[in-house]
Amino acid sequence: MNLKNKKAICIMSGGMDSTLGAYMVKEMGYEIVALHFNYAQRTEAKELFCFKKICEALNVSNSYVLDLDFFSKIGASALTDKSIDIPINGLEEGVPITYVPFRNGIFLSIAAALAEKEEAVLIAIGVVQEDSSGYPDCKDSFITSMEQSINLGTKDETKIKIYMPLVHLSKSQIVEHALRLNVPLELTWSCYKDEEAACGVCDSCRLRLNGFRLANAKDPIEYM
């Protein structure tokens, strides 16, 4: 395929996974349209700051920041409801309280609308199934079904592929890939709790730190 002038919508949280995904898309030759969501998450300001810095590093000229504050009205997640404590005692069985109901389904639906507007042929999302916190909307089967639904519910001439390059990687493999591509991991943020220094004890911090440990690499961000 000739990728000249081919656009990809990259859903970017400011985290390590979605940032690596964007760098992989750039390496493939796509023009990146960066998409970030403020969804009333605890670390909203830090994630937005990181997103903007990463866009600068990628030389992205076309970006969107969309506010989805209705997530706080839905609640039911420790990420969007501050009355619910962020778990700090390690990963547990089942779906954790940090799961935001159907977040990725909503993100992908909005990304599809933007893809139609921008005439993009790819949506990139940094979901990780194997080494994640057990979120149901990070499954390969779910993302594949969303791709089918998006193509059924858009114009006939719209053909969108959802790219999920990390879905079957472990966190250590993600770190290794990111280091090979010179991804600026110092600009990324994973912590669920804090915005100054990462807490080091929430599920997301634990997964990130373990990934660096297994990859025999040093995490460049600051921890408490």
From Swiss-Prot:
Zn(2+) binds at residues 191, 199, 202, 205. Its cofactor is Zn(2+). GO terms for molecular function: ATP binding; ligase activity, forming carbon-nitrogen bonds; zinc ion binding. It comes from Sulfurimonas denitrificans (strain ATCC 33889 / DSM 1251) (Thiomicrospira denitrificans (strain ATCC 33889 / DSM 1251)). Catalyzes the ATP-dependent conversion of 7-carboxy-7-deazaguanine (CDG) to 7-cyano-7-deazaguanine (preQ(0)). It catalyses: 7-carboxy-7-deazaguanine + NH4(+) + ATP = 7-cyano-7-deazaguanine + ADP + phosphate + H2O + H(+). Keywords: ATP-binding, Ligase, Metal-binding, Nucleotide-binding, Queuosine biosynthesis, Zinc. Pfam families: QueC. Its EC number is 6.3.4.20. This is 7-cyano-7-deazaguanine synthase. Binds 1 zinc ion per subunit. InterPro entries: QueC (IPR018317), Rossmann-like_a/b/a_fold (IPR014729). It is an enzyme of class 6 (ligase). The keyword ATP-binding applies. The gene is queC. ATP binds at residues 12-22.
